[in-house]
């Protein structure tokens, strides 16, 4: 039985010509979000951060970027994310075309020591030789980069150093050269997450030796 990848963070970053976030524009965003988000102080001049503590979601805006982050036990909802980002897009009078980057972070039960299992699975040399070359070797990471138009993707698997009973899984996908609608972005983000938790997870288990 496949051990699931538990989502810990989903982040979607839209590049957009937002411009100066005046106090009036900030208030319009807050009004449109109907009190669900509260402003949060950030050490970046001109940036605007909003947090929904109940849902563990955050929005971060600069003059050139709109970023959505969900943390905790994430259950990504394309429709909710589209509604939320769409409200901000409309208040700021942005065109519905964005280059975007997504990042997904997950943890996966190692069913043992993630340190040991990555050394056994990922070393190009016999593990005993690798340990001789690197005394005190703790673990190894694997990074896979690939393209699936319009996306350039990056998948990383390594031990979770704060708790070696788990693997740390990170997946990035970016469409930096292609402008996409918000509806397409959240749909594709949902599809990538499903693939990460499905076929990619199956491949990860195969690479790790089951």
What does each model-identified segment do?
Residues 17-18, 70-76, 108, 173-188:
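A generic structural motif
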Residues 29, 77-88, 186-196:
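Well-ordered, non-membrane alpha-helical segments in soluble/globular domains
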Residues 51-74, 78, 82, 154-175:
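Amphipathic N-proximal alpha-helical interface segments
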Residues 68-108:
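Aromatic- and glycine-enriched beta-alpha-beta binding-site module
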Residues 147-210:
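Mixed-charge, glycine-accented linear interaction segment located at domain edges/termini
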